Amino acid sequence: MGIFRDDWQELTESRNVGSIYLTHLIRGRSDKYSYNTLLKILESGFLRASFSRRNNYDTVKGNQKVVCFQDTSFDAMQEIITGEKWLDREQGYREFGIQMPKEILFYNGARPVIYDKANEIMELIDESIYWRVVNLDLNIATWQYVDWTHEHEWRIPGDVMLESGDFRVIVKTEEYKKRLIHEPGMKKLIKKPKNIIVFENEVSKNIELS
């Protein structure tokens, strides 16, 4: 038995683990690089699907390109970003991205990924949903671990169109928000300033509430 939407939203937000929004965080070697990537996304009007290539390796199984999101709170995103910096990943996540309502993405085909040993689970499921598989391998024999479960990842096949009113933009600081508002064409695309979310403010807000 389900619950009403308002109850679902209240429960989800009170848990401070997931969110009613799914977040597409942007990777980049610097804040400047990630901000410029964000601008290109906004100017194109799409999140482009890919095979999510990392270290010259496609992380998406099968032949279906996807757009990746995370079902996480801002606190959890901060931990993910901090962890990537600790691992010294050149193309790590930055505090820039796009958020879209989870229910709309779900309606359009987005689903949580399946964390499991890829070679085992792919023998049990249809090839048409290989795109949902993310390899999980905690190999105590070799002490070589592959574990992305902290990302709480969702994926959706194909490009995702950014429709006015149905997305929010994440920028790192107030300074980047002011800069974004004055970029050519942004006032028309992002009609409400409240739809530009300042990452550091959201994290600070949660610290004050705790």
Identify what each model region corresponds to.
Residues M1-S210:
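NAD-dependent ADP-ribosyltransferases
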